[in-house]
Amino acid sequence: MNIKDLITEERNPNTMNIDSMSTLEMVRTINHEDQKVAAAVGQQDQQIARAIDAAAKRYQQGGRLIYVGAGTSGRLGVLDAAELVPTYGIKPERAVGLIAGGKKAMLQAVEGAEDDLELGQQDLRQLHLSAKDTVIGLAASGRTPYVVGSLDFANEVGALTIAIACVPNAVISSHAEIGIEAVVGPEVITGSTRMKAGTAQKMILNMISTGVMIKQGKVYQNVMIGVQPTNAKLIDRACRIISTTTGVSTSEAMTALHNSANDVSVAIIMIETGRSKADARNLLAKAHGNVAAVLQANK
């Protein structure tokens, strides 16, 4: 399929005169188009759930979440990977974002990088990809060579491959074990896939990474117990998490956080079971980091 035939390159009939709209009309028109995104993502719920279950299994075995993409898609992958570290307390090497053209491409376009089929393979080789890993290929157009090459190499290694596109029958879907196609329709500004397509990809990545982390026990009830209290805001959040999940006062939560060496999960277990820090850590390790499982077994 030629690029001009992709739905992401079609002109949107609802925005043909956006250049003559009032500012308020522009805002309302863009918002109206954005409302289509959640519905398009929702139509892919079964595929997204499949992706979460499969990726969670690999991650539990010690694998990594590796995102590959170009342009906006690549930047969204890098963003998702980066956010998992402070949010869930995982090691930086467990979530990696690769963008065609490298770090420079995060801030400016690197001409020709996305069209290099072998570049994606080279980038993955440098990570020493294994069958335990999950590679998530992102391409709004569904055809970016950098992503295709990455997925092909990942398949050869035996890694789990997931493709996220915003067109039907995407090329990258045929190069992945699981294909997710959120068809959001023509963009407000023709071909500007940083808009609806980018929003859809971000929503899907939110679901996948959050789901995988939940299944690793990084969430207790609905709070992020893996949060790293590295600044004042996060220390306050950690104390509130401990307080609201255990019922202790804020001052008691602060003391528990200190006694647990700033480990929210350990602090909760110490409070709820009366165990020492060392015992709490051992229980948590045996339960593969699942706080709920520890508390259930030690009522």
Residue ranges with predicted function:
Residues 43-58:
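A short, well-structured juxtamembrane/interface segment
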Residues 32, 212-299:
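Short, amphipathic alpha-helical interaction segments embedded in low-complexity terminal/linker regions
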Residues 1-40:
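Cofactor-/ligand-binding subdomain signature composed of acidic, glycine-rich
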Residues 58-59, 154:
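A generic structural signal for well-ordered alpha-helical segments
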